[in-house]
């Protein structure tokens, strides 16, 4: 069965590649600005459901589509993608030395199965080096990440402790997705 990643995220694409999952990447447009909630869990769930509805429009026989959305929560305050460098700096100041949560809602739809998962990755952070913050902001890497969180590079050396489910922190529950894909394969062979 052909798998489509309904996301432009290079991090999500890399996660699938690292797990040996073959896929085609296609952008799905869903207007997250239409969501009025400020609750991080509700927001990420509704954004993923919206993307899932868009995916249903693309769904063809013998095709499965995976979508996901992530937000960061610091003290239950939602951080989405920063709109500019000043907002990025404010996000990083709130995260500095605190616990962050990356809430990721992942979903799969196929002709035989619909799977949706909301998971949380938690990390306790050490204080950021101010000169590294400046370099990070200048690099522009923060622009495509919810809450400017990049566990694969900038945030990595500052993690004091974290939960085990790193793929959730990177934006896709790969372990859950693998289980859903196996179940889907079994169901389609019946």
From Swiss-Prot:
Record-listed E.C. numbers: 3.6.1.9
GO cellular component: cytoplasm
Keywords from the named record: Cytoplasm, Hydrolase, Nucleotide metabolism
Catalytic activity of the protein: a ribonucleoside 5'-triphosphate + H2O = a ribonucleoside 5'-phosphate + diphosphate + H(+); a 2'-deoxyribonucleoside 5'-triphosphate + H2O = a 2'-deoxyribonucleoside 5'-phosphate + diphosphate + H(+)
Subcellular location: Cytoplasm
EC class: hydrolase
Active site: residue positions: 69
GO biological process: nucleotide metabolic process
Predominant location: cytoplasm
SUPFAM superfamilies on file: ITPase-like
Pfam families assigned to the protein according to its UniProt record, in alphabetical order: Maf
HAMAP family (alphabetical): Maf
Free-text function comment from the UniProt entry: Nucleoside triphosphate pyrophosphatase. May have a dual role in cell division arrest and in preventing the incorporation of modified nucleotides into cellular nucleic acids.
Name the UniProt record assigns to this protein: Nucleoside triphosphate pyrophosphatase
Native source organism of the sequence: Helicobacter pylori (strain ATCC 700392 / 26695) (Campylobacter pylori)
Highest classification ranks of the organism: Bacteria, Pseudomonadati, Campylobacterota, Epsilonproteobacteria, Campylobacterales
């Amino acid at each position: 069965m052909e798998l489509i990643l309904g996301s432009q995220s290079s991090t999500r694409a890399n996660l699938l590649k690292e797990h040996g999952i073959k896929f085609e990447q296609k952008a799905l447009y869903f207007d997250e600005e239409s969501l009025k909630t400020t609750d991080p869990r509700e927001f990420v769930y509704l954004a993923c459901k919206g993307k899932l509805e868009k995916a249903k429009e693309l769904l063809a026989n013998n095709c499965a589509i995976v979508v996901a959305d992530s937000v960061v929560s610091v003290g239950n305050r939602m951080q989405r993608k920063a709109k500019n460098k000043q907002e990025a700096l404010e996000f990083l100041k709130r995260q500095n030395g605190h616990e962050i949560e990356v809430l990721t809602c992942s979903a799969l739809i196929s002709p035989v199965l619909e799977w949706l998962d909301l998971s949380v990755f938690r990390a306790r952070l050490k204080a950021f080096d101010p000169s590294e913050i400046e370099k990070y902001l200048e690099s522009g890497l923060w622009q495509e990440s919810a809450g400017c969180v990049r566990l694969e590079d900038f945030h990595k050396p500052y993690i004091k402790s974290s939960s085990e489910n790193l793929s959730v922190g990177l934006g896709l529950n790969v372990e859950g997705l693998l289980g859903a894909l196996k179940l889907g394969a079994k169901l389609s062979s019946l």
